[in-house]
Design a protein with these regions (language model features):
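Signature for phosphate-centric chemistry
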Residues: 13-140, 146-328, 332-431
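Bacterial Sec-dependent N-terminal signal peptides
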Residues: 1-15
Length: 431
């Protein structure tokens, strides 16, 4: 369904205004956790209801870059440019910074950084403060993780923080191959999907993005860095946008290492160029991992059904008094959290937008608001003190979100309604 003209969100700022105010967000899903920027008070529970169970899925926190090849490629590019006499004085400064960023991550690519651990500790502290009845003495907290080290250490940091809040809770941490099909997409369909991405199998959206990219002007950044960028692009086999975007992302990624001096990057890239890079990344992420409006996307989102099934299963057990854990926590990856958001299709986080216009998409779907490092979703269940009546709410990045479900108590819903909605959504992708 095309939804560009019927967006259910009314953003207070344009995407340009938002990125200008918070330039670190221009690298989209690679930005540090942005929850604090959008924090709002959550709704009070209806009278008589108390929390008794929480189900959670969180992306790992800030990490080193996933693969050495990204920064290594730029080190080689700047070496080539220097050898050919193509670097400006500013380009030489950028070369030194890129080399420093690469060297700092050497041997640690893909690993959690201290900033990432602290993000999860802070989220855990806020979870404890909001839902203290779930973390009283003797409570069991069950956590499962992707087998990637960054996810395991995110899980450990989260649980360590909960134990600091209440030392007498029992934390059970598991990172097992048996959980991986639930924690992250696996199987033939997901593997085929990721293979196509890695090997640049063309889709219709690639053509749309190419036409848009050809109209973008990066002359300030290119002239600031190089006396002539064309030989560097030819040497790497990349377009001008691909090279300039990669340079920006590598330099801006330093926020995940705890470095926050933007003076060099902001002297190279104009606000217009920064915003164009953001729109490029935003569009690519929507079309790669989030948009349910894309052709054949249902085949990929069908791989999320095991996570939906797991959430439903353990919630049902908790309601029936057969789940001895008061919290089921899961630690995984950005693309699976995006898949869960696509399945839920919250009123505030629609995933069914038209993708025919790169600029317009950035005004209705903004990746940095949905999926940064440590982004998370929390399903919180409440029971009435004097009955067995159960309501639940959903928090995305610690803020209330709503569903297209009738409720007199929104953002609180009857679990049976949410259960049916999630199962129906998941089933629609299974077909």
């Amino acid at each position: 369904m095309s939804a560009l003209c019927i967006a259910t969100i009314a953003f207070a700022q344009t995407s340009r205004e938002e990125i200008d105010a918070h330039p670190n967000l221009a690298i989209s899903t690679h930005s540090v956790y942005a929850g604090a920027l959008y924090a709002k008070p959550i709704a009070e529970a209806p009278k008589g209801y108390e929390p008794f169970y929480i189900s959670h899925y969180g992306r790992h926190g800030s990490r080193c870059e996933a693969n050495a090849k990204y920064s290594a490629e730029l080190v080689k590019a700047f070496d080539f440019a220097e050898q050919k006499g193509l670097l400006t004085a500013k380009g030489k400064e950028a070369k030194a910074l890129i080399e420093k960023i690469h060297a700092t991550q050497e041997g640690r690519f893909g690993e959690l950084t201290p900033a990432g651990a602290e993000q999860h500790k802070a989220i855990a502290r806020r979870m404890y403060q909001r839902f203290k009845p779930l973390f009283k003495r003797g409570s069991i907290i069950s956590s499962r993780s992707s087998t990637y080290t960054r996810c395991i250490l995110s899980m450990a940091a989260f649980n360590e923080s909960l134990k600091e809040c209440e030392p007498l809770i029992e934390t059970r941490l598991v990172a097992s191959e048996s959980d991986q099909k639930m924690i992250r997409p696996t199987g033939p369909i997901a593997n085929e999907y990721h293979h196509n991405i890695r090997h640049n199998i063309r889709h219709d959206w690639n053509d749309i993005l190419d036409v848009w990219a050809a109209k973008q002007d990066f002359s300030h950044a290119t002239n600031a860095l190089f006396t002539d960028i064309e030989p560097v692009c030819a040497h790497l086999g990349k377009s001008k946008l691909e090279l300039i975007s990669s340079i920006y992302k590598r330099m801006a990624f330093m926020q995940n290492l705890g470095w926050h001096d933007r003076s060099l990057i902001d002297s190279i890239f104009t606000p217009e160029e920064r915003h164009a890079i953001y729109k490029y990344e935003n569009y690519r992420i929507f079309c790669t991992y989030a948009g349910t409006s894309l052709k054949d996307s249902d085949r990929y989102f069908a791989t999320m059904n095991l996570l939906v099934d797991d959430i439903v299963k353990y919630a049902d057990l908790a309601i029936a008094g057969k789940n001895n854990a008061s919290a089921d926590l899961r630690f995984g990856h950005d693309y699976y959290l995006l898949g869960l958001l696509a399945t839920a299709n919250f009123n505030e986080i629609r995933m069914d937008y038209d993708y025919s216009d790169v600029d317009k998409l950035a005004e209705v779907w903004r990746s940095h608001q949905f999926i940064t490092m440590a982004s998370n979703i929390q399903f919180v269940f409440y029971r009435h003190k004097k009955s067995d009546d159960v309501l639940m709410r959903i928090l995305h990045n610690e803020n209330d979100v709503t569903l297209p479900i009738a409720s007199d108590t929104a953002p609180f819903y009857k679990w049976e309604d949410v259960r049916k909605y999630l199962n129906d959504r998941a089933a629609s992708f299974r077909k």
